Structures are given as structure tokens and as C-alpha cells.
Amino acid sequence: YVTGFLYWFLNYCPMMVNFYKEGQKKAIRKESFGFFFEGIWWRSIYLYNAREQGHHAIELAKRGCAKSYFLATIMSHNLIVGESEATHKRCITILTAAQKEYLKDDKDGTLNKFIPELSFVIDNTPFPNLLLKNSPNEMSWQMGYKKPNGAIGGSMNQVLGVSAKDDSDKLRGKRGWILYEEMGTFDGLLELYDVTRKSVEDGDYTFSCMYLVGTANNKESSFLSAKKLLYAPESYNIQSVPNVYDKKGSGKDVFGFFFPAYINRAGCYNKDGISDVIKALLQVLMARYKAKYGADPTSVLRVIAEDPITPAEAIIKVKDAYFPVASLQERADTLDKNPSLYDDIYVGELYTTGTGEIEFRPTDDIPIRTYPVDNDTKGALEIYSMPKKDREGKVFNDRYIIGVDPKSLGLILVIK
């Protein structure tokens, strides 16, 4: 079935679309209506189920999959006709972002997509078209009109743009749909989310939906807070789906909605918008292979983060790092999924015997395995493998290297 938002998206929301000719690499970009893509259909079904079941929604996605256009669709739909037949008057929709450029119509933000959609519907459809307020500068729109006697008529539906940063007071009391653009840029996202939940929930009931979206490899995003919402959605009343995205044995059992690089990749789908996943994956992996042998060691990380296959790849923070970030992230996900892997690690302390020998004894101290930590956290010594000794019971000379980090946690690493 086609949801109301998807129907509106396909029929009333012109956008800039890429067109390709078979056998040519040249493409043109022009205004048209969006194509029917299975990934966008999945998104609409996910959002519909979230609303119907009284949950909120969250999405992590690749670039170029119409996230901002879909947010603009929700805004224009709710402004002109309301959320539904039951709630078609005084419906409020708020678009919020940590930075104003994600909103403003002159910065190619979401409002830059919303305003043309609104103009098209007003000019070309018989839907209500009288605006009581139309102020891009104030990021405020309201349907309605003034009657001759001065009274206000019409639906009085509203759309507001709010640059919230981490100030939860800007969203406090806003009782309507709340759309978070580039959620990863909110440093205090969890606190902001918890506060705004009170504005859209009443006990166990949810009367408006919050929808959070984030883009893979956004340079301004850290995703520190967003990861908790993505990997533990049910703890925050967010619609979850089975985690079919991560590799088996890594990640959590459930996740939010993820739009990976192999879904609806350009040139890798048929006329019905159904993806050729194998073809897309081969292209993605070939691009990584080529980047691996480039001059810049971080190039492969950027390629991975731009076209993520798994959620962990989408939130890689690409900096001037020369560590195998993707492999480390995969290992971290495996440990999160299987904490029993820590069972073979020795935890304890070192002491000096009466003969001057250094020995190890186990303790019940708790090692530091999550960051950041409080300054007064004690931590513990962990040994992954006991030192190898020769036939005389002595540790081999020159076999181990000790590295010391004098700052931060005062970390000492013994490496074989």
C-alpha cells in the first residue's frame, strides 16, 4: 500500500531529479516529480507504522536519498491538509536543526525544498491556498484568512522552523510533529529528545510524532548521542526494526531505519524502482578497493562513510587518523554483541613477592571499557595473554614493547 505521505511526495512535491541516458555517463538535473524507489517506500511504511503504533521514528541514511525532500513533504502535507482526516485543523509541524544553514531557504536547507512544494500545491491544486502568514525570514507559515469582521478562518495549520542547537527550551511546549534535521549535529541530543517527548506524549499515548534523520559522513556530526537512539530505539519509544543491516554477530538485534548505499544506487535499479543489490554492492566495494591504494590513507574511510553498507560505516568520523577505523568499529560492535568474549581476559593487579619477583593476582576491580569516564574512575589491569617464558621460567628479552600515555587515563600498553 501507499501511505498518505508517499502519495503526497509522488504527486504534489516537485524536486530536483537526476536523469540518466543508457550508455552515457552524462546526467542532467532538472525539476520533476520524484521516482518511486523501494527505499523511499520502506521509509514511508516505517514512518506510518511508527505513528500508528504510538512511537517516534529515526533514520540514518546515505546521501542523496531524498531525506530533506521527504521532511519537506511532511511539512507541506501537514500545513495544507493536516495530518489526517481526524486532525486537519490547528496541526503544528516544527522543523528543527542545530545549525541554521540546515533550515534556511537560501542555504539549500530543508526550507529550500519546502517552499517550492508549497508554491506548486497552491498554484496547481484545489486544496486550500490562503496563507495567514508566509514569512521565510521568520521561518513561519500558517494557513487561514481574515474574515471581514476580523475573525480568523481556515485550518490555521502551522509550519515553524526552529534553530534549537542544544537549547531544549526552544522546543519545550511545541505540541506537534517535530522533525530533526541532521540529528548528529546536536551535541545534547538525548537531553533535547527527552524534554521534547513531554510535549508530544501524554502518559502512554503519543499524539504527535518526532522524526529524527541523519546523514552518513556529515562532517559536523559526531553521532555520540544519536547512536544510543539508533541502537536502543525501544528504550526511547522509537519504532524499531530487526537489525538486518549489520554483519552477523555484530551490532544489536534491533535498529532504527537505515537507508544503505546499495539501495536505489544510481544505475542499479529497474524501471519499478527495485534495487539490483548485487550490482550496487560490487560498485561500492570496487570504489573502496581503488581508494585503498590512493595517496591519502584516509581516502578509503571517506569512501566508506559516503557509501555505507552498514550503520557503523555511516557514522565513522573521518579525521586525520591512520588507524583501521572500519575494522576497529567492527570489532567494537562484535564485543558489544558478545560480552562473553571478555571472559578470557585476566583482571587483577601486580605485586612484588618476597624474592623481588613481579607476580599477578586476580581482583574484582572493574576495567574501563566505555568512554568517556569520570575522573575518579579507578579502572583495572587487564592481561589478554600472559607473558611467554623460556625454559628457565624467565620472560623472553626484547619480545614486548611498553607504550605509555601519560595523559588522559594514564594508560600503559604492553604489546607483543
Name each region found by the language model:
Residues 1-56:
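Pre-P-loop entry segment of helicase/translocase ATPase cores
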Residues 52-75:
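Walker A/P-loop
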Residues 61-64, 98, 215-218:
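Conserved H-loop
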Residues 72, 108, 112, 116, ...:
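RNase H-like, metal-dependent nuclease domains and their acidic two-metal-ion catalytic environment used
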Residues 78-90:
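Post-Walker A helix-loop "phosphate-sensing" segment adjacent to the P-loop in P-loop NTPases
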Residues 89-165, 239:
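Conserved nucleotide-state-sensing and coupling region of NTP-binding domains
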Residues 100-103, 166, 216-220, 263-266:
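Conserved nucleotide-binding/hydrolysis micro-motifs of P-loop NTPases
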Residues 196-207, 213:
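Substrate-engagement module of ASCE P-loop NTPases
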